[in-house]
UniProtKB/Swiss-Prot annotation:
Lipid-conjugated positions (N-palmitoyl cysteine): 22
Swiss-Prot/TrEMBL keywords: Cell outer membrane, Lipoprotein, Membrane, Palmitate, Repeat, Signal
Cellular localisation: Cell outer membrane
Signal peptide: 1-21
Topological category with respect to the lipid bilayer: Lipid-anchor
GO cellular component: cell outer membrane
UniProt name for this protein: 16 kDa outer membrane lipoprotein
Gene (name only): smpA
Main subcellular localisation: membrane
Lipidated residues (S-diacylglycerol cysteine): 22
């Protein structure tokens, strides 16, 4: 009889411990930082549309952007030095796209034949990489090799 009571006690105790452990909720949850934001083509276009740098107006450029065609933008007034636009616009572009979850990787600056005494367009080229998984990321991987943004000053490039 004592053996049966002892066995019953062990079964009840084990069941109680199991029930308590299954209901144990963590008191300090941690976020999963490996989860990435899903980036869409609209995010990319909004980032281009929202770009701001000195007197270049990007309004209307993002919404009409087609991959494979350069985005051409003219300054509304004044100009910038070639060195200034290389650093300043390059950083603005990288920041605007990063805010939408798009990695530009290396941005190359091509001044072509531009000099401080002319208005020749300069180009910024990069290959975007979307963070996360989406149809846009697949499109980037399969068809988009490079995005080009051409800037033309209103007046000659400054020194």
């Amino acid at each position: 009889m004592n053996k049966k009571i002892f066995t019953l006690f062990l079964v009840v105790a084990a069941s109680a411990i199991f029930a308590v452990s299954c209901n144990n909720k963590t008191t300090n949850p941690t976020s999963n930082s490996s989860e990435k934001k899903i980036v869409t083509e609209e995010d990319f276009k909004n980032a281009i549309e929202g770009l701001t740098y000195k007197t270049w107006a990007f309004t209307g450029k993002g919404k009409s952007f087609n991959f494979g065609s350069p985005i051409t933008v003219e300054a509304t007034s004044g100009s910038d030095s070639l060195a200034g636009v290389e650093k300043g616009f390059g950083n603005a572009l990288k920041s605007a796209l990063a805010a939408k979850g798009i990695d530009t990787g290396n941005i190359t600056f091509d001044k072509g034949g531009a000099s401080s005494s002319d208005k020749t367009s300069v180009s910024f080229k990069f290959t975007p990489k979307a963070l996360g998984t989406s149809n846009f990321e697949e499109k980037l991987k399969s068809s988009v090799k490079e995005v080009e943004i051409k800037l033309t000053p209103k007046e000659n490039w400054g020194a």
